[in-house]
Amino acid sequence: MEQFTVQLNNATCTVCIGAGVLGRAGALLRQHVPQVRRWALAADEAVSAFYGEWVQGSLRAAGLESRLFLLPQGESAKTPEAWVSLCRRILDSGFDRSCGVVTLGGGACGDAAGFAAASLLRGVPLAHIPTTLLA
């Protein structure tokens, strides 16, 4: 696995690439975002069918709690209705400012869930597990 850090204006972002990263998602989240123990896993419906349980198992193995929230595939994930639905489901599940959002899917999923993470409760930590090159 390769890791590198991207320096932004006020923040840094660690990028992990390589074989086995998906199975190590939980351990990597614990390492890089240690203050978060509960994650809202926002996943594209199609991607979740293949990798959702695998990622949730990785989070459980790392001692992290997660709950899966499905998003529509593609650009339909970025509609106001989909965003409101995601935010309501996350909040109705008892998530608070101590929680984070992790995305599993392509660019539209990352955009929609990233916007939810930025706007929920004045912003919560966000991590991405992209499944496409553009994501």
Which sequence ranges carry the predicted segments?
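Glycine/threonine-rich beta-strand-loop-alpha-helix active-site module
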Residues: 78-135
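ATP/NTP phosphate-donor binding region
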Residues: 1-100
